[in-house]
Amino acid sequence: MTCHDKVSDPDPFHPLSAFGCHRCHLGNPHATSTARAHMGMVRNPGDLRVADRTCGSAGCHGDVVDRVKNGVMATNAGILQTLRSHWQGLKPLRTDVQLLLGQETAGDLAMDYYRKMCAGCHLWKPRDDRRDEVGRRGGGCSDCHVADETQAIAQKIVKGQTFHHPGLTTRIPSDNCVKCHNRSARIGLSYFGRYESEGYGTPYEGSGLNSRTLSGNRFYLHLQPDVHASKGRMDCIDCHTGVEVMGDGKHHDDIDTQLDITCEACHVPKFSLNEAELAATERLTRLNERVPVSGGEAVALTKKGTALYNLREKEGKVSFYRKADGGRIQIDTFSRQKPYHRLSGHERISCQACHSGWMIQCYGCHLTYRESGQQVDWLTGAPSAGRWEEKRGHERFENPALGIRGAGSRVYPLSPCQVFFSYDGKGERVDGRPFKVLSIAAFDPHTTAKPSRSCRECHGDPKVLGFGGGQLEGAGVSSPTPPVYVASSSGLAKDFPLDAFLDSTGATLQINSHDGTRPFTTAEVASILFVNLCVGCHDDYGDKIYKDFGKSKRRYLSGEEALPCLSEKNG
């Protein structure tokens, strides 16, 4: 290398003395003129459009590039499938970003919405095509593995001065994750205790709006961060594995099937001394450069069998190491001997149902499509006919409802996304089309707290059960008094609270879920509410009535006079 001889190494594993420029940036290494040397050169080797010839070239990371192209962060398959499933009347369509990049038009309103409102966040998107947060997104491999590109771009190449090449790293900073994961489920914000507020910019600071701002003219309030962030000082990569983030080589239609990590992977760990897992641990530890080298320790495995190289066990002692600085954390493993973990009837409850401190919830948002306007299509980069406008109703964070996740049976916190949609090509009012669709999703809100919900918070809160904000009357549920959001006062012809999934009889008011996620059934609600009759007095997990609650329930229903609660009632 004779032209750019004063350039820093991207990292210890890609020294310029060995790689030069052309191995990553292409071009002609044998040319003697600048024009010829730069012919065919690429600025971003991580761009998925060229990655097969750069990062994925022979002897480099070919298998990883193939995995990334099939992963949901490149395909957006989960977003596309969910969006179409929520758009009433549309048939499922299996597609992905790479296929859509070759199409000039949307085909239907759902795809037009995706192209103009969602498609600025995927790994096929060119990096630095704008001067805002959206411009920082995309770029294939570089989206995650380049940490300081902004500073590097600001540099000018000056003869005789060292040019600081953007650094490559496997110690991916959480900022690289949050630049994308701050919309929709907003888990990147929630994890660090940031709750996106209603958008008023309050509380005001002097004569101006609040300085706690997010991209897109949004604001946030400080809430309790996830305990892994506040106490453990852990980054996203400390839990989320490379196999999970970059994909496992399979094409997944939703993010759930690509996920690899679980609470149990660390808190009910399974360790291995298998040669293959130990070899993977040694290799990943060497690339990380912060996590200590294993000294004969067993390594933990995820549900897919991925080696968690930063979680190890030796002589009964479990050690977790942060990937950013190698800091050691003593893990508290799960104990089924604790009465609250082995309580009969709680077998289906997920960790998140009890230990999530709060969860973003959106109600009453309005989506308008105007044929007369124009808006940029993120996939073509050019404006096209039709413009979308989003208006929010109200957001909440407290007491998320619980329900059943997907086609399984586990109880999870539910987050709604309620959108009213108006579209009429003639600009006329359309009546007689009732709105009864509330999209719900069950996921980990990333607001883990060591203290769990109390018994009454689950068994005695109508909102948690799916009835919306209200109050209990004995063993039944009344309507909210007043409702959190009065739909009729806002011009919506609805006779139920917007935050209610069920009416007082347990009948479904509004629901839409592409994966089978649902609120509790009438029978499940009745079972949950019956416990609420008891927890006022029997408020300890170890109380003897819970050892065989079915028997206790039968004794109560039979009117057994020896029971203190019935004797007091009869007296």
Regions found by a protein language model. Give the residues of each.
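Short helix-terminating capping/connector loops at secondary-structure junctions
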Residues: H14-P15, V134-R136
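C-type cytochrome heme-c attachment and multiheme electron-transfer modules
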Residues: M1-P10, L16-R130, D148-T150, P166-G571
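Long, hydrophobic, well-ordered secondary-structure blocks that form the structural core
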Residues: G135-H165
